Amino acid sequence: MNRVWFVTGAARGMGVSIVNAALQQGDRVVATGRNMDKLRQIFSTVAAENIALLELDVRDEHQAKVAVDAAVRRFGRIDVLVNNAGFCLLGRFEEATAEQIELQFATNVFGTANVLRAVLPVMRQQRSGRIINTSSIAGVKAVANATFYSASKFAVEGMTLALADEVTPLGIHVTAIEPGFFRTEFLSNSSAHYGEKKIEDYADFGDARELLASADGQQQGDPAKLAQVVCQMVEMENPPQQLLIGNDAISYVMPSLEARIKEIREFAALSNTTDFD
């Protein structure tokens, strides 16, 4: 069956690759983003009957509802939602301002929720749908120098898992994808944000901009292959609720998961001391 995809953050990075992969397999796509000129440029060769380009700042709940309504008017349904819009705030906990923290959560967490609230009534009426929320390895094992990005992705993980339990009985499958490092502009100066405060006590441990600048353009992950993984997952009868993507993702996360299990067992006796006598 040809599906209708609704993709946020479609004007760059993994969003572009996911849109292209869906189109290549004969599906139709609603590609959304804040920069309409960029969307038109990227997808200028796509036949008009296969794509709809819509302006969407996910932080705007009303705009999310308007975009979803327009998508349904155009294609009649939404089979796959990919919540891909987001950015990374880099820097240590104390280096970020309150305004920067709020913007990180407004985009990565509340923006995801805004689009979900707009799309879920459509999928409930259909009694079917696939939702892909873009998390990160930072949502499984927190990354130093990306404190609030990690926190935002932990929030996405919790939201995804709870939502999956709520809507799976309605025929809607929800997955958090947890990519490692992929070769996109995600770490570039045009995309990443940095904490505005500089604290001398941390100087000897390196600067987030310097630490990650050397990795930009050298990431081993291929976003086109990630998009193929997403397409395969959409075809699964019982997709995972969480999916690590990338060899580096598994190698990064597994030691922390094993350490957590070890810690739980080590302190189980202390944990079990709180029941009434």
Predicted ranges, named:
Residues 116, 152:
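Active-site helix of classical SDR
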Residues 92-93, 100-102:
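Substrate-binding pocket helix/loop in short-chain dehydrogenase/reductase
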Residues 136:
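Residue(s) in the substrate-gating loop at a strand-loop-helix junction
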Residues 25-40:
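Conserved glycine-rich Rossmann-like NAD(P)H-binding loop of the short-chain dehydrogenase/reductase
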Residues 56-66, 98:
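The beta1-alpha1 cofactor-binding region of Rossmann-like NAD(H)/NADP(H)-dependent oxidoreductases
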Residues 11-13:
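Conserved glycine-rich cofactor-binding loop
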Residues 168-215:
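C-terminal beta-strand-loop-alpha-helix "lid" module of Rossmann-like NAD(P)-dependent dehydrogenases
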